[in-house]
Amino acid sequence: EISCSLVGSEMCIRDSRFTYDTPTVPGNDFYALCEGEHPLCMIFLPGFDHPVSREYITRYLKTLPQLKGARLVCVVRSSAQAVAKATHGSDFPFPVICDGPGVLYGYLGVEQTRGLLSWSFAAQKIYKAARDAGYHYDTKAPQLLPLTLVVGHMGKILFTHSGRSQTDLPEDCAAIREITREVVRTMAEDQRRAHPHCSDETLTLPDLVGWDDLDGSSN
């Protein structure tokens, strides 16, 4: 079951039962995914078979060596079974969360827009290439807009960007790396102002994302 809640004034994805499915492995622990030395970037896309999803997942796969100091998760509005069928059961080098019912999409407010209003020039090129390859789409149907999050310990959301068009999301893994670096840099500056006795060497990612606060261990 996917569930979310608000903690204080900060948004967190929190529920002890929150597990997620990938195309090959069901029931993964979301909070274990959030743990780690590097921040986690979550990118919400339309269904896996959508031309924009295919385009950007392909870009991320091709540029994955540039993803240094960060981690990537793509979320698609498709069932794990549908993605597994489309990929013939192949694994991805980064997690692909399959949220067919759209529980996370609904809670986090992933927006929809009508047809061509969401089409950037880049999106038009993607759709043209897909149409030339035999893909058919309804130009008047609502379209999901992308959402980019940087998530810390226990699902704490550190950064959010709601796309204004279907291609308003990180271009590649180098862009994802720069976003996460900026988030960490900004939080480090805030932490230094709050604790001027700390040096750069004493600040770790748990410090920056407020792990102690979420664990209830700080006074």
Regions found by a protein language model. Give the residues of each.
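Structural microenvironment flanking redox-active thiols in thiol-disulfide oxidoreductases
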Residues: 54-107
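Short gly/ser/thr-rich secondary-structure transition/capping motifs
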Residues: 20-27, 130-132
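Cysteine/selenocysteine-centered motifs that mediate thiol-based redox chemistry or coordinate metal-sulfur cofactors
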Residues: 186-219
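Thiol/selenol-based redox catalytic cores and closely related redox-interacting motifs
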Residues: 99-168
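Single conserved hydrophobic/aromatic residue that forms the stacking wall/gate
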Residues: 1-8, 12-13
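Hydrophobic alpha-helical segments, especially N-terminal targeting/anchoring helices
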Residues: 14, 21-23, 151
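Short active-site neighborhood of thiol/selenol oxidoreductases, capturing the structured segment around
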Residues: 30-62, 71-75
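A short, polar/charged loop-to-alpha-helix boundary motif
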Residues: 164-185
